[in-house]
Amino acid sequence: MRNWRWLLLVLAALLAWLQHRFWFGPGNSGEVRMLQVQIVQQHQENERLRQRNASLAAEVKNLKDGDAAIEERARSELGMIKPGEIFYRVVEDIPVPLPNDTSADHGVDLSQPRREKR
């Protein structure tokens, strides 16, 4: 009977030690969950980078093989035009508010007559 008590005490102490290591020791359950979250985030980042690499590889292939991509880049990024082409720049007009338009009040009282400087 006495041996059973010692065995039970040793098993309880072993169980307590294992539980302590599981919850508070190195590699505990909190750290494991945190690492699992980091793994998921890293997988997402890796997938984003894979897609970016594929896009860049396609762009490099297109630049090596096609003249259209080179021409598009030269036009958009460097502002180049072909010989003989005429470049037109379209400039949008700034809308002028009407005298009775209160939505476009720019701090000017339109009800007062305008004084001209001499």
UniProtKB/Swiss-Prot annotation:
The gene is ftsB. This is Cell division protein FtsB. It is found in: Cell inner membrane. Residues 98-118 are annotated as: Disordered. The chain crosses the membrane at residues 7-24. Belongs to the FtsB family. Part of a complex composed of FtsB, FtsL and FtsQ. Residues 103-118 have a biased composition (Basic and acidic residues). Residues 30-66 form a coiled coil. The lineage of its organism: Bacteria, Pseudomonadati, Pseudomonadota, Gammaproteobacteria, Lysobacterales. Residues 1-6 are cytoplasmic.
